[in-house]
Structure formats: C-alpha cells, structure tokens
Amino acid sequence: MGRQNIVVVVALVFMAIIGLAAAASSPSPSASPSKAPAASKTDHVEAPVTDDQIGTTDDDAAPTPGDGDVAVAGPLGSDSSYDNAPTGSADSAKSGAAALGVSAVVVGVTSIAGSFLLL
C-alpha cells in the first residue's frame, strides 16, 4: 500500500513539473531585420587607429548589396550593436518567479492530497 502512495506522489510531482514547463514563457520572437529600429547616428571622437587593429574602426556596419533600408548590427562590442538589441518588459523577470512559486504550491497541495487519498 505504501508503494502505491509513492507512485502517485511521484506522478503528481512529474505532472507539476510538466505544468511548469508548459507555463514557462516562451522566448519572444526576434524582430525581423526590416522592422528593427535604426541605430542613432551621433558624432564622437574616436581613438587613433593602430596597425594592430582588425576590422572596422567606426560603429558603422559594412555596406551590403541589397536593401539599404534594412538595419543591420554593427561590429561586435560596438555601441550600435547594442542599440538593436530587444528589450524585455519590466515584469518579464518576475513572471518566472511567480510561476515557480505557484508550481511549488501546486506540488505541495497535490502531494498532500494524494497521500490522504491512498491512506
């Protein structure tokens, strides 16, 4: 009889984990390049270029053949590469914690209810 209780509790915990995985927020779809905001153009003074520098020396992306209206990211680590990054909403970090808290409560309640049902 005790072994059946363990099986039921494990099954309930497994279902709660599946519920948590299903309720977790999916990653937001990335914005298409044609809808990405254009990087702001600001004038600033750059350090002199040395012979050891590789790649572009400014924040502009390399020219590409094709649509000139499409915004593309600049070199890695440049200021313009961060301008096109998607921003999360203010409560997106809290939503995962709330789902985890609700899931923990559901697991606790279902395991206690399951143990009382099979006693």
Curated annotation (Swiss-Prot):
Residue ranges annotated as Cytoplasmic topological domain: 119
Transmembrane regions: 99-118
Query: Could you say which tissues express the protein in this record?
Result: Expressed in mature pollen grains, developing microspores and tapetal cells.
Please tell me whether the keyword DNA-binding is annotated for this protein: no
Leader sequence range is 1-23
UniProt topology in membrane: Single-pass type I membrane protein
Where found? Membrane
GO annotation (BP), single: pollen sperm cell differentiation
The domain of life for this entry's organism is Eukaryota
Q: Where is the composition biased (Low complexity)?
A: 24-40
Disordered: region residues = 24-93
Q: What is its main location?
A: membrane
- Show the ranges annotated as biased composition (Polar residues): 78-87
Q: Which residues lie on this side of the membrane: Extracellular?
A: 24-98
Keyword annotations = Developmental protein, Membrane, Signal, Transmembrane, Transmembrane helix
What is one GO cellular-component annotation here? membrane
What function does this protein fulfil?
Major pollen protein required for pollen fertility and development. Active in both diploid tapetum and haploid microspores.
**What is the name attached to this protein's record?**
Anther-specific protein BCP1
Question: Gene symbol?
Answer: BCP1
